[in-house]
């Protein structure tokens, strides 16, 4: 049951996680995946089949823009960065997610309100 809860939480917070990372700096897809894996281990890792569609949805929504850059001979990388709208959305989403996480910890730890 815990695995399904983690999966649901990850699915529901993927956009906020990506926006939060891109708020720090521009990154390419593999770099984003590696950063998620480094910070969250297997619990936050995203497959290419989940990562790139999520990035494309953010791009279609005007929150992220992408550009191609040479990364060596005959090789390019697609870098993602936040638009102004994306930065505002990231700030709001990350703050809401952090507030919700604190609330969940407080409620589930049995600490008085």
Where does each model-flagged region fall?
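Basic amphipathic alpha-helical segments that dock to polyanions
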Residues: 51-58
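Beta-hairpin "wing" of winged helix-turn-helix
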Residues: 59-76, 81
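Accessory beta->alpha helical hairpin/"wing" motif in late/C-terminal subdomains of nucleic-acid enzymes
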Residues: 82-87
């Amino acid at each position: 049951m815990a695995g399904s809860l983690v999966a649901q939480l990850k699915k529901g917070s993927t956009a906020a996680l990506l926006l939060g990372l891109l708020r720090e700096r521009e990154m390419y897809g593999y770099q984003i995946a590696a950063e998620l894996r480094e910070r969250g281990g297997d619990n936050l890792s995203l497959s290419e089949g989940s990562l790139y569609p999520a990035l494309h949805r953010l791009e279609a929504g005007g929150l992220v823009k992408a550009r191609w850059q040479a990364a060596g001979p005959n090789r390019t990388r697609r870098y993602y960065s936040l638009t102004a709208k994306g930065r505002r959305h990231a700030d709001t989403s990350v703050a809401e997610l952090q507030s919700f996480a604190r609330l969940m910890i407080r409620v589930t730890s049995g600490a008085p309100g």
